[in-house]
């Protein structure tokens, strides 16, 4: 049974009438451009065919009822007439409440709604299950009440909800790609202007995501430290963000910087350049150049930004040994565990899967999870 069928059936059973709309919003993977988003830089993600699906209908009052199919059909109810506050027990409900509250704060006028939510974006894998939920809820209200919002505004609203209501600091990339993703394309995003450019993906190439299943422990504290180091670097150059510093300017005075800060700055500057070049390489179907850029990105994250762990490096090495220069592979996400992403010719996917199955657990004691994805369409009706 598809997520659409599942949520429609649950909706009818729970609420006693049929849903009028079904909306989906996808998760994402970032192909290249790591930790560049909060430095006003470039990222190159694609939406994936794992998504959050919501069957819904408008109500003729001011009540919101939300059922979470993946959390034992837990039900949350709240009124649009009262101040929206955090739910004491259901963390999932706060993503919904946050999006609704921030849409209200943006002076959008809408009535009540019934929703049933289900999703298959793996949680805790760095594939943006939370952003996909936020964008799905925003799209539900936009579609049901014809709100004058475009995808970028729905994305910004979701980011605001996560930062201010849920209390998790995140950049804009995750929500933006979920809202604006394009089938068979990646999206080059300028995180300063929020401008986007669709980049066609080469035919016959699979997007493979492998979760190391190494439990991330340092990610919060180390993430904040990296941010501070980048801000220190930008201040040294008297610029608003590292986006505004050239590699030539950096090389001329690198020796004057604190050695750790210098390494962090070098990663951001070179990663930004790699990301813009990767968009061109991908569009031209130049997998050999993509391989080089992804390898350089991984080495930079390992040696300059210092956010990889041995388990991730092992996974990258296993995949690289199989694909050679026919595709690219690197760590993706915040670091200290999580996933790797690989662009692999479809005919090599079984060999990669076999090599990883045979070697990764033997070397690390951890079993990986393997996902083969297609670049998918952003949020909308399904």
Swiss-Prot record:
Biological role: Catalyzes the transfer of the gamma-phosphate of ATP to D-galactose to form alpha-D-galactose-1-phosphate (Gal-1-P).
Localization, UniProt: Cytoplasm
Entry binding sites for ATP: 124-130
This protein's GO CC annotations: cytosol
Enzyme Commission numbers on file: 2.7.1.6
GO BP annotation list: galactose metabolic process
Site feature Transition state stabilizer, where: 28
Annotated keywords: ATP-binding, Carbohydrate metabolism, Cytoplasm, Galactose metabolism, Kinase, Magnesium, Metal-binding, Nucleotide-binding, Transferase
Keyword Cell membrane among record annotations: no
Chain sites annotated for binding Mg(2+): 130, 162
Pathway: Carbohydrate metabolism; galactose metabolism
Name of a matching Pfam family: GalKase_gal_bdg
NCBIfam families for this protein: gal_kin, PRK05101.1
Residues involved in substrate binding: 34-37, 223
Catalytic activity annotation: alpha-D-galactose + ATP = alpha-D-galactose 1-phosphate + ADP + H(+)
Catalytic center residues: 174 (proton acceptor)
Protein name listed in UniProt: Galactokinase
Protein family: Belongs to the GHMP kinase family. GalK subfamily.
SUPFAM superfamilies documented for this protein: GHMP Kinase, C-terminal domain, Ribosomal protein S5 domain 2-like
């Amino acid at each position: 049974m598809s997520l659409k069928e599942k949520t429609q059936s649950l909706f009818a059973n729970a609420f006693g009438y049929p849903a009028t709309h079904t909306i989906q919003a996808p998760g994402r993977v970032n192909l290249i451009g790591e930790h560049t988003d909060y430095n006003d830089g470039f990222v190159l993600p694609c939406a994936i065919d794992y998504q959050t699906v919501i069957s819904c209908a408008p109500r003729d009052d001011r009540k919101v009822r939300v059922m979470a199919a993946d959390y034992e059909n837990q039900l949350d109810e709240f009124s649009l007439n009262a101040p929206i506050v955090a739910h004491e027990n259901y963390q999932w409900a706060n993503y919904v409440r946050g999006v609704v509250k921030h849409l209200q704060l943006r002076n959008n006028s809408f009535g009540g709604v019934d929703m049933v939510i289900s999703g298959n974006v793996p949680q805790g894998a760095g594939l943006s299950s939370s952003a996909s939920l936020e964008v799905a809820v925003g799209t539900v209200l936009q579609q049901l009440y014809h709100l004058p919002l475009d995808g970028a505004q729905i994305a910004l609203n979701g980011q605001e909800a996560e930062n201010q209501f849920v209390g998790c600091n995140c950049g804009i990339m995750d929500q933006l790609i979920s809202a604006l993703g394009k089938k068979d394309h990646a999206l080059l995003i300028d995180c300063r202007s929020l401008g986007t450019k669709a980049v066609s993906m080469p035919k016959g190439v699979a997007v493979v995501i492998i979760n190391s299943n190494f439990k991330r422990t340092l990610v919060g504290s180390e993430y904040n430290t990296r941010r501070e180091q980048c801000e220190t670097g930008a201040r040294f150059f008297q610029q608003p963000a590292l986006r505004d510093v050239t590699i030539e300017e950096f090389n001329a005075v690198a020796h004057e910087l604190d050695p750790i800060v210098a390494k962090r700055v070098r990663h951001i500057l070179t990663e930004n350049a790699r990301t813009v070049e990767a968009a061109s390489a991908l569009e031209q179907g130049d997998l050999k150049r993509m391989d080089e850029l992804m390898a350089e990105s991984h080495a930079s994250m390992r040696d300059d930004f210092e956010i990889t762990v041995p388990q991730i490096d092992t996974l990258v090495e296993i995949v690289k040994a199989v694909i050679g220069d026919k595709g690219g592979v690197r760590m993706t996400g915040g670091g200290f565990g999580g996933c790797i992403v690989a662009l692999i010719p479809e005919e090599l996917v079984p060999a990669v899967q076999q090599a990883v199955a045979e070697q990764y657990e033997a070397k690390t004691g951890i079993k990986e999870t393997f996902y083969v994805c297609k670049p998918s369409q952003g949020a909308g009706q399904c």
